[in-house]
Each structure stands twice: as structure tokens, then as C-alpha cells.
């Protein structure tokens, strides 16, 4: 089987906006014969992430155990989405979301991401989306909510 001609990167933060972007990226990928890669960036501490995810059970151990548990948790969630949408690859990163998305975008043909903002230009697009648009080396498709 020939490898896909195009490849799309879809940043996922598990919000409804990012999942809508994934659905749209999937439709486009099917039409174009492109591959999908899902990326999740953990921007906050693992302790805060565990609490935000309602997974306080993961906090019973040293911080390395918490980090490993959260990484595993997000990897499982990404794998589930990848299976559902036929993504070829999943990636996990830690750091500032916009910076990690731009770094990961190199080598892809398109980044497809959601828009969750509320007011003003950065609010309209969302701060992360605006930063990615301003600095990304490849085209970015922004899917409105």
C-alpha cells in the first residue's frame, strides 16, 4: 500500500472544539487520502491535570508515578480517538501548547485545530490558536465551534 500523499497534524486538548476539529480533519483526510497524527500537549503540572481530569486516584504516589500515570491516561485517550478516526500516529508532549504544536508541525502539510475564543482577536481565535497561526511553518486550518 502506498503511503499517503498528505499528512495532517491535529492538536487535541479533549475539548469539544478540538474534537470538532478532529471530525473535520478526518473528513478532509478521507477525501484527500491523507494521514492523521494526533498531538496532545500537557501544559500544566501533572497534579493539576489529574485533578482537572477528576483522577485524584492517580495522586497516591511520588510525583514520578503521578507523571507516568497521567502520561498513560492521556495516551489511552489519544489511542481511543486514533482508533475511532483512523489516525496513523499519536504523540504526547509537555510544555506550552502553541510552542509544541509549532514544533511538531514541521513535516506535516496542514495543522487542523479548533477555535474556542470569546472576544477580541485573541479571544475570537483563542490564544493558542492565534500563536500557532502567527508562527507555524505550515498552513493552519481553524475549525469554528
Residue locations for each model-derived region?
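Structural beta-alpha unit
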Residues: 1-4, 17, 79-111
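Small/aliphatic-rich secondary-structure junction motif
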Residues: 2-60, 104
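General small-molecule cofactor/ligand-binding pocket signal
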Residues: 37-39, 89-93, 141-143
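Short secondary-structure boundary segments
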Residues: 40, 114-116, 144-145
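Short beta->alpha linker loops
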Residues: 42, 73, 92-96
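A short acidic, glycine-rich active-site loop
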Residues: 56-76
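Glycine-rich, Arg-bearing micro-motifs that act as flexible, cationic patches
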Residues: 110-135
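Short, acidic/small-residue loops that bind anionic groups at enzyme active sites
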Residues: 135-145
